[in-house]
Amino acid sequence: MSEQGTHINKETRGFQSEVKQLLHLMIHSLYSNKEIFLRELISNASDAADKLRFRALSQPDLFENDADIGVKLSFNAEAGTLTVSDNGIGMNRDDVIEHLGTIAKSGTKDFFSKLSNDESKDSQLIGQFGVGFYSSFIVAKSVTVNTRAAGEAADKGVSWTSEGEGDYTVEDINKTTRGTDIILHLRDDEAEFLNEHRLRDIIGKYSDHIGIPVHILVTENDDEGKPTGSKWEQINKAQALWTRNKSEITEEEYKEFYNHVSHDFAEPLTWSHNRVEGTQDYTSLLYVPSKAPWDMNNRDSKHGLKLYVQRVFIMDDAQQFMPSYLRFMRGLIDSNDLPLNVSREILQDNKVTQALRKASTKRALTMLDRMAKNDAEKYQTFWTEFGQVLKEGPAEDFSNREKIANLLRFSSTHNDTADQTVSVADYVSRMKEGQEKIYFLTADSFTAAKNSPHLEQFRAKGLEVILMHDRIDEWLMSQLPEFDGKPFQAITKADLDLSKFENEEDKEKQKEAAEEFKSVVERAKGYLGTRVKDVRTTFKLHDTPAVVVTDENEMGTQMAKLLAAAGHDAPEVQYIFEINPEHGLVKQMANEADEETFGRWVELLLGQAMLAERGSLEDPSQYVAAVNKLLTKV
């Protein structure tokens, strides 16, 4: 506890605007789960203990002759206060202002833009964001924080006070002990947290697994029940959960530990706890979350596993142990092979790190594969939340490309819904006799994909096509040439050959029709010039007069859009214009003797094909003029 003398250097400061917004939303959105404030405060105390132990490896004087680190809870029913104290790393004045007056997270404004004023939805988002210390204001009308950083003089203590409104007060104090005391002045209707049994229940529920002892101040009574004094009593096991035998750990304990390491309110989808001995000696505890964090799509946001070395905390967000496409994984690695003075720089090119990364990646992919096979509904939840991120995998991790491909899910003409439930293995199991390729189509949306004219011949021949409508899909497929020995084939390519699924009579008729249509093709080429790479006849269409396609090695439409959206200069796509000789509009164009009118027909059909392929035209006015002039002749 703090010992305060004269209050000096006192100032009142305004909260960062995001803090005010978070406090307001949190108090209203999380009230139904208000007991989590104690979990958050004890979790912070545990982190402070971890940081002290780590820094004391190189600066043992930071222990100040007190290496027994722990958390203490005490309450005063008359005063209506609950105090959570720790003797961890503590804070100086700058730390207090930075950590208690602002939210030092990148993308904070983006996070708040996603809030909807729907309390149930916002509570999930706030839980993902991590409320930490601010959760105190769910139950407290005011909060005082007295703290001193380890290694600082007693007169370097700091006191921070706020009612959780627009501002806070910070001042210097004397504090003989290092660490932090958080004094909650509880609201009048929160007396339940001034009860020893209630506090014991909460600690048992949320904090049994942390690696430092939690003590509560209990009253001692004589034989007649009269109070004679008080003592500190430990109320948690204080053994790090991952060091215990798996058979002794309950499912509920694993879930609560996930909440502790991730600061996520939701339950994990699955987890894997492993002790490995041999060439490598380490323990890993990995979790797959059920909800994506608000900044999941930001590759630069902090992510990674907690790293311990010989049960000593080293760092949060150790990105070196998991590839970026698995950045949603949570948990920890405790290694006996890394040095205690390991730094992020040392981790970069360390052989032990590389071996641990390979093993943890394999473990994570195995967890996902097991979930996909054993619980399709749960895996679908995972895919909805994290599928976009997993699609980065084939480009990033060549050695595991086949495993990742097996975990991907897509829409398909087989089920004709936007739900991404079809695996590539599902598709392969339904391939027609003689089919050697996996056919796919990329588009801006599922609606655009399922209505694409490129699908007409596939539907007619009973061939399934994977429908891809996520922004990343074109890039994904450029990194995924095959699956199980079968090549992927984009159906928008000019050299697509489905002749093996046609009879000889049809082939002969098409050959004759193409020959008869040569002159029309040449006229169209002459009109369009270099606006297209080529003009050809096609017999793969049924209800559509024309399409545009690209050569096999030519950049496709979706890739060009992806590069443009990312700010890159993309070469212009060289389209091949394919016309259907059997369609009424094409026949009408072919019979047009007037070259000017013929040109308008070409503009009409090319414009339609470009709209179907790209969703837009470079020169809409030219297309509209051609349509209008043709309509005046009707």
Curated annotation (Swiss-Prot):
Its main location: cytoplasm. GO terms for molecular function: ATP binding; ATP hydrolysis activity; ATP-dependent protein folding chaperone; unfolded protein binding. Pfam families: HATPase_c_3, HSP90. Residues 562-634 are annotated as: C. Keywords: ATP-binding, Chaperone, Cytoplasm, Nucleotide-binding, Stress response. The keyword Cytoplasm applies. GO terms for cellular component: cytoplasm. PROSITE patterns: HSP90 (PS00298). Residues 1-344 are annotated as: A. InterPro entries: HATPase_C_sf (IPR036890), Heat_shock_protein_90_CS (IPR019805), HSP90_C (IPR037196), Hsp90_fam (IPR001404), Hsp90_N (IPR020575), Ribosomal_Su5_D2-typ_SF (IPR020568). Signal peptide: none annotated. It comes from the Bacteria. It is found in: Cytoplasm. Residues 345-561 are annotated as: B. Belongs to the heat shock protein 90 family. Molecular chaperone. Has ATPase activity. Homodimer. This is Chaperone protein HtpG. It comes from Photobacterium profundum (strain SS9). The lineage of its organism: Bacteria, Pseudomonadati, Pseudomonadota, Gammaproteobacteria, Vibrionales. The gene is htpG.
